[in-house]
């Protein structure tokens, strides 16, 4: 074997354009944190569902990429996006169609084996699958029409609202909700009837925020895995028996997205599509609503928030200035925020790594502020 040939080939690679090393570090880091939590908290059982979901998700994703290629489910890149993204055109998409069901099956199996199965898990499973289906319809239309646009914004919001209302009716009828919102420390605010419209807004906002974040290889899957892990740890620390099943749900979701990340990091071999991103955001919002961790989710999901706010600012300022002075002004080079940094010349992997690091810092902050 010509070892010199392989060594020279390795040296010639631009490792800054490969997200595998940092993805492996992220996976190892979350595994180590889960081990520490399990060792120091008696009832914590994070490691087994985490490892299981990582392995199974990675296997299913590898198999799924082949299937997606066979049925020609490939990404269509929008013309107005960054020019560097045109090379991503043709990458298999709709990867979330494998990850979401697998994570839900594993979650419910773990819950049944640990006698922690609950109505909350049923509600979360419904919410995740329903939003996945909305994303699936959107992705399928985009692929069949061969354009980077599936459902209209209006249609998507209507479907998300209908599912959100069904979910809220479900948790109300089963008395799974708490209209007291926990903020700093143990301080609470009772929202009363205001809780329900706010809850619906959070479902729509979070699902669309993760959708906007899914614009760089490994960005949404990495950030999502970190936030799910943070929520799982917070719920374990609380020590409430009712929250253990939800903590298991969170860590299984984290593991599933980490397994997916192995193939979604740069250069991505598959994208999650709206099928995955909408389900991810809805799941995070659902967990927060059921476990009174809305404030924690707001802090932990700072990247999701920043991505959404950047779009709101960009569109709002552009339309306002165009109406007033006849010419639209752009605050950012392009929105969402990650595209702004891309056009500034920052490499995609560097943006993703920095956004992961920011998410980790804010997850730690949220846990310390609980």
Swiss-Prot record:
EC numbers on record: 2.7.8.13
Topology versus the membrane: Multi-pass membrane protein
Cofactor(s) this protein requires: Mg(2+)
Catalytic activity: UDP-N-acetyl-alpha-D-muramoyl-L-alanyl-gamma-D-glutamyl-meso-2,6-diaminopimeloyl-D-alanyl-D-alanine + di-trans,octa-cis-undecaprenyl phosphate = di-trans,octa-cis-undecaprenyl diphospho-N-acetyl-alpha-D-muramoyl-L-alanyl-D-glutamyl-meso-2,6-diaminopimeloyl-D-alanyl-D-alanine + UMP
Location within or outside the cell: Cell inner membrane
InterPro entries: Glycosyl_transferase_4, PNAcMuramoyl-5peptid_Trfase, PNAcMuramoyl-5peptid_Trfase_CS
Pathway given in the UniProt record: Cell wall biogenesis; peptidoglycan biosynthesis
Function: Catalyzes the initial step of the lipid cycle reactions in the biosynthesis of the cell wall peptidoglycan: transfers peptidoglycan precursor phospho-MurNAc-pentapeptide from UDP-MurNAc-pentapeptide onto the lipid carrier undecaprenyl phosphate, yielding undecaprenyl-pyrophosphoryl-MurNAc-pentapeptide, known as lipid I.
GO cellular component term of the entry, any: plasma membrane
UniProt GO BP: cell division; cell wall organization; peptidoglycan biosynthetic process; regulation of cell shape
UniProt organism field: Prochlorococcus marinus (strain SARG / CCMP1375 / SS120)
Membrane-spanning segments: 21-41, 46-66, 92-112, 117-137, 151-171, 181-201, 217-237, 243-263, 270-290, 298-318, 349-369
Record key words, sorted: Cell cycle, Cell division, Cell inner membrane, Cell membrane, Cell shape, Cell wall biogenesis/degradation, Magnesium, Membrane, Metal-binding, Peptidoglycan synthesis, Transferase, Transmembrane, Transmembrane helix
Protein name as catalogued: Phospho-N-acetylmuramoyl-pentapeptide-transferase
